[in-house]
UniProtKB/Swiss-Prot annotation:
Protein name in the entry: N(4)-acetylcytidine amidohydrolase
A GO term for molecular function: hydrolase activity, acting on carbon-nitrogen (but not peptide) bonds, in linear amidines
Record family assignment: Belongs to the N(4)-acetylcytidine amidohydrolase family.
GO-annotated cellular components: cytosol
Pfam families cross-referenced by the UniProt entry: ASCH
Annotated Gene3D superfamilies: Hypothetical protein
Gene name linked to the record: yqfB
Keywords: Hydrolase
General function of this protein: Catalyzes the hydrolysis of N(4)-acetylcytidine (ac4C).
Length: 103
């Protein structure tokens, strides 16, 4: 069985598959992805594979520079996005945006 390259919380699976979630915001430990990378995607909870994505762009962002566009690409409000990122990465402020499309 081939390992997954990146995982997402299961609650995001439907939005990813439907194309409503087109970015992910990660910390430095996942800053190595590059435009053009093709990644196997699994669920964080059980590592079960559910799709393959292609990285279409990467950039950096801080909590203070998150925008409504980031929130739209995450399929949530800006307030929700800031809370989710702060909950997942407490105490961190520098992040890496990975834009992607499902293949």
């Amino acid at each position: 069985m081939q390992p997954n390259d990146i995982t997402f919380f299961q609650r995001f699976q439907d939005d990813i598959l439907a194309g409503r979630k087109t970015i992910t915001i990660r910390d430095e430990s996942e800053s190595h992805f590059k435009t053009g990378d093709v990644l196997r995607v699994g669920r964080f909870e059980d590592d079960g594979y559910f799709c393959t994505i292609e990285v279409t762009a990467t950039s950096t962002v801080t909590l203070d520079t998150l925008t409504e566009k980031h929130a739209e690409q995450e399929n949530m409000t800006l307030t929700e996005l800031i809370k989710v990122i702060a909950d997942i990465y407490p105490g961190q402020t520098q992040f890496y945006v990975i834009e992607f499309k499902c293949l």
